[in-house]
Amino acid sequence: MAVPQLYYFTIRGFGEYIRLLFLDNGIKFEDIRFDYEGNEWQEFKKGMLLGQLPCLKVDGQEIVQTGAIMRHLGRVHGLNGSNEQEATFLDMFFEGVRDVRMKYVRYIYYDEGTREDCVNKTIPEALVKLEELFKAHSGDFIIGNKISYADYILFEELDVYHVLDANILDKFPTLKSFWERMWKRPNLNAYLEKRKADKVWINAIEKGMN
């Protein structure tokens, strides 16, 4: 199998879930990053299926849409649960996390509500539901003690919210413990520490970095 190529921007954004999955599982990949406003991206965009990123190219196939990429990698690398029931639960959890992300996006890019609203109401109200859903399976991860593709989006989004407010996870001990465990994973820790030190932007604008 050829080394997969991941195309995304120089920010964390939606591409970061995919990077984390590759890194944590020791899967070699090319991490190709475009400047959001650069000419290189504008030219590359013209030849793409839907004209958007992230894009994963593997064995001649171009896969776009974040969810499609993550589920593909989940199936290929044994990160999609052990049966249809678990796979469906992961699907549900993944989409639930993305719904929370879109609430955050509306604050970041469209100034919907204040930072205080986002930190004290919008995100916490959603995390209450995710905390309960996480508890449906006992163990360190979403479906027990085996990591899945959905754990990477959950971790990244929790980290994004923690950057926004360092205390935001304190009322959600199960999710906070999960977030702390993920930070300590051997294949992720050095990358995460460097990302933090380099202050890699989460979004296409600086908003959300403090």
Curated annotation (Swiss-Prot):
Tissue: Expressed in cells at the mouth and adjacent to the pharyngeal bulbs of the head and also in the tail.
Enzyme class at the top of the EC tree: transferase
UniProt keyword terms in alphabetical order: Transferase
Result of knocking out the encoding gene: Increase in susceptibility to 4-hydroxy-2-nonenal, paraquat and heat shock and a reduced lifespan.
One Pfam assignment: GST_C_3
GO CC annotation: cytosol
Domain of life (superkingdom): Eukaryota
UniProt-listed InterPro entries: Glutathione-S-Trfase_C-like (IPR010987), Glutathione-S-Trfase_C_sf (IPR036282), Glutathione_S-Trfase_N (IPR004045), GST_C (IPR004046), GST_superfamily (IPR050213), Thioredoxin-like_sf (IPR036249)
Positions of the GST N-terminal domain: 2-81
Domain spans labelled GST C-terminal: 83-200
GO terms under biological process: determination of adult lifespan; glutathione metabolic process; heat acclimation; response to hydrogen peroxide; response to UV-C
Oligomer status and interactors: Homodimer.
Summary of the function given for this chain in its UniProt record: Conjugation of reduced glutathione to a wide number of exogenous and endogenous hydrophobic electrophiles. Responsible for approximately one-third of 4-hydroxy-2-nonenal conjugation. May play a role in the detoxification of reactive oxygen species produced during pathogenic bacterial infection.
Similarity comment: Belongs to the GST superfamily. Pi family.
Name this polypeptide is given: Glutathione S-transferase P 10
Species, as recorded: Caenorhabditis elegans
Gene that produces this protein: gst-10
